[in-house]
Amino acid sequence: MEKGQLIEFRHQGERRLAVVDRPDGKKDWVVIDQQGQSHKLKPQRVEYEIPGGPYTVDDLPSFLGEVDQYLDPSSLEVAWELLIEEGESITPADLALLLFSEQSPSQCYAAHALLAEDKLYFKQKGNHYEPRPSSQIEEIKHQMRVQAQKEQEQQGFIDRVNQALAGEKVTWEGSDRLRLEALEKFILFPEQNHRQALDILQTLGKPGRTDETQNLLIELGIWQRHENLFLRRSAYPNQFPAKVSDVAHAYLTNPPPDPDQERFDLTTLKTYTIDDESTSEIDDGLSVETLADGGHRLWIHVADPTRLLSPNDELDLEARKRSTSLYLPTGMISMFPPELATGPMSLLQGQRCVALSFGVTLDEVGAVRDFTIAPSWVKPTYRLTYEDVDEMLVLKIQGEPELPLLAEAAKKRAQWRKSQGAITIKMPEAIIKVNADEEVQIYLQETSVSRQLVAEMMILAGEVAGRFCQEHGIPVPFRGQPQPELPSDEELLSLPPGPVRECAVRRCMPRSEVGITPSRHASLGLDLYSQATSPIRRYTDLITHFQMKAYLRGEPLPFSGEQVQEILYSVMPSSKEATLVERQTNRYWSLEFLRRNINEVWQGVMLRWLREDDGLGLILLEELGLELPHRFDRPISPGDRLSLKVSNADPHRDEIRFRELLANEA
C-alpha cells in the first residue's frame, strides 16, 4: 500500500472507504475512513483498491457522490443476461466497461459495490465474479421471498404484541400461533433449545427468562394467571379432535345399533345413584332385590358406554389415548366427549338407561355365595349425595328399606374382607375446589357410612368381575398388590394412634400392579380383583366391559390376551402421567391457598421423618388434610403437635416454608 491510495475494508461487517495515511510498524498501515476515523490495518484486510490517486480524505465526499449515480442494482440483471450465455467470470473493472462503457475510478468502484452487495446474480471467486446458473437464481429468489414473508410476519407479530400490551384489541394471525407456541414451549421445557423464542424476546426487549415470558403471555391474554403448566407439559389432550366430536354429536340423535338387544329388564327395581353433588359422570347405581326365600340380592349397576362403542373405533381409540378422566380442582376433563359422558353414557335419574349389572348374594359372613352378570336396562329412582344417604340412614326412613340393607351388607363385606387380611388405612383426605373466580376451597373428606357403602359395593363388583373372567378364561386387566411387610405390633403401639400410626402402615404398602394374570390384592383382602365399575372414566374398566359383554353374547372376544397386554403397555404410562398431573395440580392450588392465607395459624402434627439428619419431616395440617414437608430446628418426634404459620409460599416455584410458633404466639 502507498500513502494517498484509496481502499475499501470492512469494520464490524460494514464496508468502509478509506485513504491510506501512513505506515505503522513493519506491516500495518493507518487509514482514515469517510467518517474521519483512523484505523490500523494489515494489508490482508483490504478488500478492494480503487485505481487513480493520490487521494485525500477531503476527496471522499465528492468521490462517493460520483459513485452514487452509478449504483443501480437492476443493472446487474442486464449484465448477468449478457454474461450467462458465455459463462465467463468478470472483475469490477470489466463490469464497469460493460455497464458504463468506461472504467473511471468511480465507475470501477461502483461496479465493485454492486457486486459486493449482490446476493443473487454473481458469485465471488477470488478477485473475479461468476454469473450464477438461472436455476440457482430462481432458488435464491424463492428463499428471499420466503425470508421477506417471515420478516413481514415477524414485524406484524411484534406490532400486535405491542398493541395488546397497550390495551388494544388484536386479532392474532395464523402465523402468530407458531411464535406464541415457541414462547409457550420455552416456559414449559426450558431445558430444550429455544432459539426462536429467545430471538422473539430480544426483539420485544424482554429478558430471556421463563418467569418473565409467562408474565408476558398472561398480559397478552394467551394464558391465565394460574395456567396449568403440569397439564400443558403432559401428553393429555385438552380438546377432542373434530372427528371424535362429530361422532359424539351424531350419536346423541342417531346412536348405533345396540349389540345387546336382549337386555335384562331391571327398571322395576328401585335404584340409587350415590355421588358427590358435583359429579357429572354417573357411572354406578345400587339396588336390592328381595328373593322368594326372603333373602336379598344386591345389584350393582354400572354404566355401559360400550353400548355406543366398537373396539378400535374413533371413540374407543381416543379414550385409550387419554386412559382416564382427569379430575382437577378447576374441573374435570373427561375421557369421552362430555356430551356423551354426562348424557347417554351416564345413569341419569328417571331415565331408562343401559347398564352392565352385577347381581350378588352374600352368605352369612359376607362372602360371595353366587352372582350373575348381565347387560341390562335400569331406571335410576333417586340421585343422592353421600350426605343425603347418611341423613336417611340416621332418620331410618321407612319408605327406603333398601338403604339400611345396603349399609348392612357393606358392613358385613368390610368385616369379611378384614378377616381375609384386608388392610384399611384411614388418613385425612383434602378436597380442593377452585371456582370460576379462582377462589380456592379446601375441606376434609370425612369417612362416612355412605362412602363406605359405595366403596364396598364397588369392591364387590370388582371381585365378581375378576372371578367371572378367571372362571371363563377371559383376559382382562387384573389388579393385584403384593403382601406388604408391615411394622410390628410393638412398633405400631409405640406410635400415637391416628394419622401417625396410619402413615407408618401406608409407608409399607407396595404399589398395586395391573396385568392379565389374576393375583391377590393384599390391601383389599381379595384373591383376585378386576376393576369394572368406572368405564366412563377409566379405560382399563372399559376393556373388561368389552371382553365380558362379548363372552356373554357368545361372540369371539375382541382382544386376545396378548392384545390386552399390549393395550396395558400403552395405557398405564398415560394413566400414571394423568395421576401425576392431578397430584401436581392439587399441590399447586394447596400452596396457592396457603399463600392467600399467610396470616392464618395452622395446627399440625409431625407424621414422620423424611431426612432426619437434615431435620426434614413430614407434617399434617389437620384442618386441611394437607401433608407437607417442614424443616425442624429443634428436637421433635412423630406425633408431636405444633402451631405453624406460612413464612413463604410460591406455587409457581413449588416452594412452601413454615414458621413454628412459640407457645405464647399460638
From Swiss-Prot:
It comes from the Bacteria. InterPro entries: HTH_RNase_II, NA-bd_OB-fold, RNase_II/R, RNase_II_barrel, RNR_Ribonuclease. Its EC number is 3.1.-.-. Disruption phenotype: Essential, it cannot be deleted. Keywords: Hydrolase, Nuclease. The keyword Magnesium does not apply. Signal peptide: none annotated. Residues 263-553 form the RNB domain. It holds the Pfam family RNB. The keyword Hydrolase applies. Transmembrane segments: none annotated. GO terms for molecular function: RNA binding; RNA nuclease activity. Belongs to the RNR ribonuclease family. This is Uncharacterized ribonuclease sll1290. It comes from Synechocystis sp. (strain ATCC 27184 / PCC 6803 / Kazusa).
